[in-house]
Amino acid sequence: MNIIRVKDVEQSAEKALEIYQNAVQHGAKVLGLATGSTPIPLYQKLATSQINFSELVSINLDEYLGLDGEDEQSYRYFMTKHLFQYKPFKHSYVPDGKSEDHEAAIKAYDRIIVEHPIDLQLLGIGRNGHIGFNEPGTSFDSTTHIVNLTQSTVAANARFFEKESDVPTQAISMGIASVMSAKKILLIATGESKAEAVAATINGPITEDVPASILQKHSDVTIIIDEAAASKL
């Protein structure tokens, strides 16, 4: 693991931008993208950068079940709002949250990942150590699957909705094995609320109780953490 400590959120985004610039310059063609509040500062920098994404493919980690891409709370909408409207990709894949045939949607997404091996996978981390929507207890061998969100994850995401009861309780997510198949992984963690998860990921045992701990086994992982997120290392 390559651990990069920075002062604050702004510096974390600047360092992440450098990693993206370097990856694309060295031929990265497929970028795995994440949602949530953590990557927004990076996306703001990517949106105004000189990087040309028009020949690249993006693959997102997850999507809420039951929301289509026009819904303002969907992750497709999130990506359009924060990045895609400024930097279009050749193809942008997000799981189909509205498909009534979940098994078909899962197989289709797994096929996309196999056909487009991810060069650089971006991750955030949940307070409970989840990556994507892979909650504690998720098998390290998992591929794309339907997830029942934990109460802590629902509560953490409630700030994006009018009220907590509006937060979907299920999602379709790339699995941990899918994430680990990426050539390079970049995890960004900022804020004191992520400090325990960061410590468990870097220094704790590798356990499905802390999904992100599996990153210790990946050959090319960079973790960018600000002072607050590093406070329990």
From Swiss-Prot:
Keyword Hydrolase: yes
A GO CC term assigned to this protein in UniProt: cytoplasm
Any one of the GO BP annotations: N-acetylneuraminate catabolic process
Top class in the EC scheme: hydrolase
Pathway assignment: Amino-sugar metabolism; N-acetylneuraminate degradation; D-fructose 6-phosphate from N-acetylneuraminate: step 5/5
Enzyme Commission number(s) of this protein: 3.5.99.6
Stored InterPro entries: Glc/Gal-6P_isomerase, Glucosamine6P_isomerase, Glucosamine6P_isomerase_CS, NagB/RpiA_transferase-like
Function comment: Catalyzes the reversible isomerization-deamination of glucosamine 6-phosphate (GlcN6P) to form fructose 6-phosphate (Fru6P) and ammonium ion.
UniProt name for this protein: Glucosamine-6-phosphate deaminase
Organism field: Leuconostoc mesenteroides subsp. mesenteroides (strain ATCC 8293 / DSM 20343 / BCRC 11652 / CCM 1803 / JCM 6124 / NCDO 523 / NBRC 100496 / NCIMB 8023 / NCTC 12954 / NRRL B-1118 / 37Y)
